[in-house]
C-alpha cells in the first residue's frame, strides 16, 4: 500500500495491490479501510504501484512547489504573503475539485478558462515556453527511477 500525505486529513489516495491468493473478503476489507483515509486504487502489479508512487506518493511535493511558486509570484507583484498563499492553495483545491466533480478532462476545463489573447492564455504560453509539462514529467520519471533504485532495481 502506498498512501500519500493528504491521507492525514482523509483526502489522500492509496495505491495498492494484493497477490492472487488473497480472498475477496480480505480485498474488500482493505479497500474499505483505505477509503477511511481518502480514495484508493487497486493495481494488478508492483510496477504500477511504483509508478503510482512517483505520481501520487511524491505528487503532493510537486503540488506544494506549484502553490509556493504561484503565491511567490503574487507576492512579487504586491500581494501580502497570507493572501497570496490563500489564493494559490484555494485555486489548486477548487480546480482539482471542479475537475473531479465535473468529470471533464483537464484540457477541456483549461480551454474553458482560456480566452484567446487573454490573461490565462498569456500565462499558459509562459508555462509552455518554460517547459512546465516536461519538467513535471521529468520529476515523475526521476521519482520512479529513484524508487526502483531504493527497491534494488526491480
PLM regions and their residue ranges:
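Gly/Ser/Thr-rich beta-alpha loop segments that engage phosphate groups in nucleotides
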Residues: 6, 14, 56-63, 119-120
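Alpha/beta catalytic cores of group-transfer enzymes, especially the acyltransferase/condensing modules
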Residues: 6-7, 102
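Internal alpha-helical scaffold of NAD(P)-dependent oxidoreductase catalytic cores
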Residues: 13-51, 64-101, 146
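A short glycine-threonine-serine/GTX helix/turn-capping micro-motif
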Residues: 50-61, 110
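NAD(P)-dependent Rossmann-like dehydrogenase/reductase catalytic/cofactor-binding core
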Residues: 89-154
Amino acid at each position: 500500500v502506498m498512501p500519500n500525505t493528504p491521507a492525514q486529513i482523509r483526502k489522500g489516495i492509496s495505491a495498492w495491490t494484493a497477490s492472487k491468493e488473497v480472498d475477496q473478503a480480505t480485498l474488500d476489507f482493505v479497500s474499505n479501510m483505505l477509503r477511511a483515509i481518502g480514495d484508493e486504487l487497486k493495481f494488478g502489479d508492483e510496477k504500477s504501484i511504483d509508478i503510482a508512487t512517483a505520481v501520487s506518493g511524491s505528487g503532493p511535493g510537486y503540488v506544494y512547489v506549484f502553490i509556493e511558486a504561484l503565491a511567490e509570484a503574487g507576492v512579487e507583484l504586491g500581494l501580502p504573503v497570507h493572501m497570496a498563499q490563500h489564493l494559490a492553495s484555494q485555486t489548486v483545491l477548487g480546480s482539482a475539485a471542479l475537475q473531479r466533480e465535473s468529470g471533464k478532462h483537464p484540457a477541456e476545463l483549461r480551454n474553458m478558462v482560456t480566452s484567446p489573447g487573454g490573461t490565462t492564455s498569456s500565462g499558459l504560453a509562459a508555462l509552455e515556453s518554460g517547459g512546465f509539462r516536461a519538467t513535471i514529467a521529468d520529476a515523475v520519471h526521476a521519482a520512479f527511477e529513484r524508487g526502483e533504485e531504493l527497491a534494488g532495481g526491480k
